[in-house]
Amino acid sequence: MKKRVAVLVTHEFEDAEYSEPVEAFRAARNSVTNIEQRAGNIVYGKQRKISVSIDRSIDDASIHDFDALLIPGGDSPSSLKIDDRFVYFVRHFANAQKPIFMCSHSPILLMQAGVILGRRITKMQHTFQDLEQAGAVLFDQEVMNDNNLYISSRSTLDLPYFIQETLKVLRR
């Protein structure tokens, strides 16, 4: 059964951390819905290599419409974490025991949502102290799968491992 993947994304996301997983998800015939503040917006990655058209506003997004959540890294998670609507969405997604896929800086959004305590995730150089203080259990490896719920990767260099693991989870 093909899965429905929500992507929380706004300006300054890490280009490859959006484009490569989304391309792989679509190639495996999963649907992808880009969510931001307003449907119809166009957001750009840090390297300006790609633009993303927003399919649905956060106000119209329900966790019940999706099977998994992707949060690309870059500066996007820092912008999203100051908006309670995105924090609420992530918190309820985690509480519903649905898989969350995160690259590099995206765990800070889960930290803001209060759903990182005791979770095993990969260690990102610039955020590891904050994540440790929030109670995350950090690992310095390419990808970490915490019970098929939290799948994380350190950086764009680890994307092949990340994509492989997320596709396994989507096939379940």
Language model features with spans:
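Extended, subdomain-level signal for the structured scaffold at the beginning of enzyme domains
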Residues: 1-100, 109-117, 128-172
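Catalytic nucleophile serine of serine hydrolases
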Residues: 104
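Anionic-ligand binding patches
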Residues: 121
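Glycine/proline-rich loop-helix segments at beta-alpha junctions forming the active-site rim
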Residues: 124-126
